[in-house]
Amino acid sequence: AAMEEQLGLNKPFFVRYFDWVLGCLHGDFGISYVNPKRTVAGELLRCLPATLQLAGTSFVIVAVLSIPIGFLCAVYKDGWFDKIMRGLVFVTTAMPAYWVGLLLMWGIGVKLNWLPTNGNGTWRHLILPSFTVALSYISTYIRLIRNNMLENMKQDYVLYANVRGLPQKAILVKHILKNSMHTCIVAMGMSIPQLISGTIV
């Protein structure tokens, strides 16, 4: 009874809800049901460094892998690399992140024993969870960059650049890829809150 009174569970649901909303407006998110001696805000602050580290590492992995892969898929459209990557993108998009995480833990962590499956503190502990979180985003941005580049390749400025005699590498990187990155950068920026909220440790 004392615990119910401390947590406010003896009040009607709507009263508890409005008390919680009013508390949130003042920065008070209530008391943790898991550990009543701690506040929810305190628990969030305690987990924030690890959460930001995981989200930041995942974001770097997304950028480092999706941009060059999407670029190569567009340049070598319908080639063997493009077909393989499109197949992998289709498979990874269809697989939920928790299932991918379990497969990676079982294969890389348990069977091969290359990386730790739990714990925190070193860069090796970040690889599996970061890659698991990043995988679905990588698939999304590979498709986005590839499609944007293929669309930009049809634009008039590419024809003019070829007429001017610019090197093909310069046209691809300085013009097509640069113009294709605008929507991708916006999408990546919009996915940061989702990335952080989805990686709360």
For every predicted segment, state its role.
Residues R46-F81, N120-V201:
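Alpha-helical transmembrane segments of integral membrane proteins
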Residues A1-F18, V34, L112-L128:
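Hydrophobic alpha-helical transmembrane segments of membrane transport/permease proteins
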Residues R86-N147:
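Membrane-water interface segments at transmembrane-helix boundaries in multipass membrane proteins
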Residues A1-N10, R46, A63, L72, ...:
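N-terminal signal-anchor/first transmembrane alpha helix
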Residues Q6-I67:
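An internal, D/E-rich "acidic patch" concept
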